């Protein structure tokens, strides 16, 4: 099983991350803005809390972001101590946030310059669907590499559209 890092364990991210753990993946998570109840929920399921992006990115193969807006995703990727500045860049970023397409294009181009692969995979439906693992996930990215993330996406969604 792949080692997963998850950034953003709020209303949608918490159940998505929970489903990943419940399907047997090793999951580490980081979210500086979340309440302790979400942290405790994931810890009780077997998730590992990380205290920085540096710590989160050390031993993961895939990092998922589920953040409120494009500025948050850009900050995680390119801000001070962002993902592009970490020692391990041998991961795939799956941004599942619903953000402006221009932000996604910019983020993808900048990550590519740093040899980091990215998929844009926003979700649709309700919080209950996130809890049930029945989200609609619309994926954009390298088609040949899509097969490497499809099983992971299926832990969170019942309808995966490439």
Where is each model-derived feature located?
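NAD(P)+-binding Rossmann beta1-loop-alpha1 motif at the extreme N-terminus of oxidoreductases
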Residues: 1-66, 91
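Rossmann-fold dinucleotide-binding core
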Residues: 4, 99-162
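A short acidic, helix-capping loop that chelates divalent metal ions and anchors anionic groups
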Residues: 37-38, 73, 128-132
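Rossmann-fold NAD(P) dinucleotide-binding segment
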Residues: 53-118
């Amino acid at each position: 099983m792949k080692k997963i890092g998850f950034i953003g364990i709020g209303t949608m991210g918490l159940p998505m991350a929970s489903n990943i753990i419940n399907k047997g993946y090793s999951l580490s998570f980081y979210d500086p803005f979340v309440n302790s109840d979400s942290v405790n929920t994931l810890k009780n399921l077997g998730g590992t809390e990380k205290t920085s992006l540096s710590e989160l990115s050390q031993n993961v193969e895939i990092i998922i972001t589920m953040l409120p807006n494009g500025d948050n995703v850009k900050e995680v990727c390119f801000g001070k101590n962002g993902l592009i500045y970490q020692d391990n860049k041998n991961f795939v970023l799956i941004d599942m946030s619903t953000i402006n397409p221009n932000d996604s294009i910019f983020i993808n181009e900048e990550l590519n310059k740093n040899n980091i692969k990215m998929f844009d995979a926003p979700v649709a439906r309700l919080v209950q669907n996130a809890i049930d693992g029945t989200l609609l996930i619309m994926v954009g990215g390298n088609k040949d590499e899509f097969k490497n993330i499809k099983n992971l996406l299926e832990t969170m969604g019942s309808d995966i559209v490439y």
